[in-house]
Amino acid sequence: MNKTITALAILMASFAANASVLPETPVPFKSGTGAIDNDTVYIGLGSAGTAWYKLETQAKDKKWTALAAFPGGPRDQATSAFIDGNLYVFGGIGKNSEGLTQVFNDVHKYNPKTNSWVKLISHAPMGMAGHVTFVHNGKAYVTGGVNQNIFNGYFEDLNEAGKDSTAVDKINAHYFDKKAEDYFFNKFLLSFDPSTQQWSYAGESPWYGTAGAAVVNKGDKTWLINGEAKPGLRTDAVFELDFTGNNLKWNRLAPVSSPDGVAGGFAGISNDSLIFAGGAGFKGSRENYQNGKNYAHEGLKKSYSTDIHLWHNGKWDKSGELSQGRAYGVSLPWNNSLLIIGGETAGGKAVTDSVLISVKDNKVTVQN
């Protein structure tokens, strides 16, 4: 294994000497969202504020082009999906009209032909932040994410506390010192039909909801990898949603990034190989939680994973490394590979570069 990773490091270095995967993003980019339509990549929100950009990946002179600004204000943790030529943006965390941080449950649609946005008369039955979105048979599916009432209440309390550090410490201790099930992360699967702009119940996880999971789908199968089980506590769980036939089946696969797990990781598929890379977490938090410490990440430093794992023969194998740990960027399918755009590294620093992870014969190639 060490020889393999050493060889990969040499490959990474050789790629670094060549042209970068994509031009640097116009601003350091993290906690945003993105989608790809044919060969055009779209990214926006997060550290980009209300800005959106597109890039034609097959153009001779690749460059990011600014699009119409998002009308719903700056958002973190929104998700997006392309359906029938339009870009849909779901929820996120931002400021309301009173300047208070909140979780949104709204939907916006962007029309690339007119470079224009419209807010739809449609609201999900629950807040959407930390959720994942994927497309299947012309519908968008949403699952996971924080509980809107609990999350909004936390920020209302912080707003009232203002600069009173004693009150803030008390609020944080109260917020984080609960068991995972007491946060009521969303375990329902919702479907959104663009033709009717209606939300429907599509099922629910037999286990628990997560926030900040990585998601990837191919054909009738979708995978949800890791994420938070509660604020500050990750899970190493991997869930598979199988739409084959008339009944949706939920399967639980072998864990990855054990024992602590990560959130904000990246998932993709290359030559039928399922890839999971990066993510951020708190080493030791799982042990703390199992020992009865609900505020499991208290005093721990967030770490950023460089690991690249492949799903092979019913288990995960560490098969390579990123040049640096990163999380909370955008992962997209491109050129039969996993494309990672932006993200944050140690200390929460937003980055502007992109990474391409490809797999052939169970060997990983990383291009920066």
From Swiss-Prot:
Catalytic activity of the protein: N-acetyl-alpha-neuraminate = N-acetyl-beta-neuraminate
Kelch repeats: from-to residues: 40-84, 86-137, 139-173, 174-219, 222-265, 287-336, 338-367
Xref: InterPro entries: Kelch-typ_b-propeller, NANM, NanM_proteobact
Record keyword Repeat present: yes
Paired cysteines (S-S): none
Assigned GO CC terms: periplasmic space
Compartmental location: Periplasm
GO molecular function (one): racemase and epimerase activity, acting on carbohydrates and derivatives
Segment forming the signal sequence: 1-19
Residues at the catalytic site: 228 (proton acceptor)
Keyword Plastid among record annotations: no
Pfam families: NANM
Keywords on record: Carbohydrate metabolism, Isomerase, Kelch repeat, Periplasm, Repeat, Signal
Top EC class of this enzyme: isomerase
Enzyme Commission code(s) on record: 5.1.3.24
Quaternary structure and partners: Homodimer.
NCBIfam families, sorted: muta_rot_YjhT, PRK14131.1
Its job: Converts alpha-N-acetylneuranimic acid (Neu5Ac) to the beta-anomer, accelerating the equilibrium between the alpha- and beta-anomers. Probably facilitates sialidase-negative bacteria to compete successfully for limited amounts of extracellular Neu5Ac, which is likely taken up in the beta-anomer. In addition, the rapid removal of sialic acid from solution might be advantageous to the bacterium to damp down host responses.
Family in the record: Belongs to the NanM family.
Name of the protein this chain belongs to: N-acetylneuraminate epimerase
Source species of the chain: Escherichia coli O157:H7
